[in-house]
Amino acid sequence: MEMQKEYPMTQEGFDKLEVELEHLKTVRRPEVVEKIKVARSFGDLSENSEYDAAKDEQGFVEQEITKIEMMLRHAVIIEDDGSKSEVQIGRTVTFAEVPGNEEESYKIVGSAEADPFEGKISNESPIAKALLGKKVGDEVNVPLPNGNEMRVKIVEIS
């Protein structure tokens, strides 16, 4: 029997997934069922593009529901222990490239709630893996997508 993957996440991320799941079940699912019903009323299903599109959408919605339910079932909530002494999941880390002083900040979260456009990176990303467990003042090499590395200094953990 294989071990089920755990999904580390903040309470905020867990709550957001619960809201998304509720929306999928109570809004999106009924919408798709209605689209299928309307498309069926057009008659012949063999050449009914509306029906095919609605069935595809239904498959996507059901897949999302299943995925989110599984993630919530296997979620591991990262408790905030109040310590800001080292980089950990749920913390925002500010670092600067060495040499240089241009700072960047990212919140390290579980993969389920990662969103680079909101400044949230997955704990499984190369940059987060390099930073986790480090302290303010530490310098670390962060792997870049092109195969090179960038040296950064941790400026702040919040």
From Swiss-Prot:
It comes from the Bacteria. GO terms for biological process: DNA-templated transcription elongation; regulation of DNA-templated transcription elongation. It holds the Pfam family GreA_GreB. One of its GO terms (molecular function) is DNA binding. InterPro entries: GreA/GreB_C_sf, TF_GreA/GreB_CS, Tscrpt_elong_fac_GreA, Tscrpt_elong_fac_GreA/B, Tscrpt_elong_fac_GreA/B_C, Tscrpt_elong_fac_GreA/B_fam, Tscrpt_elong_fac_GreA/B_N, Tscrpt_elong_fac_GreA/B_N_sf. Signal peptide: none annotated. Keywords: DNA-binding, Transcription, Transcription regulation. Gene3D superfamilies: Transcription elongation factor, GreA/GreB, C-terminal domain, Transcription elongation factor, GreA/GreB, N-terminal domain. Belongs to the GreA/GreB family. Necessary for efficient RNA polymerase transcription elongation past template-encoded arresting sites. The arresting sites in DNA have the property of trapping a certain fraction of elongating RNA polymerases that pass through, resulting in locked ternary complexes. Cleavage of the nascent transcript by cleavage factors such as GreA or GreB allows the resumption of elongation from the new 3'terminus. GreA releases sequences of 2 to 3 nucleotides. This is Transcription elongation factor GreA. It comes from Macrococcus caseolyticus (strain JCSC5402) (Macrococcoides caseolyticum). The gene is greA.
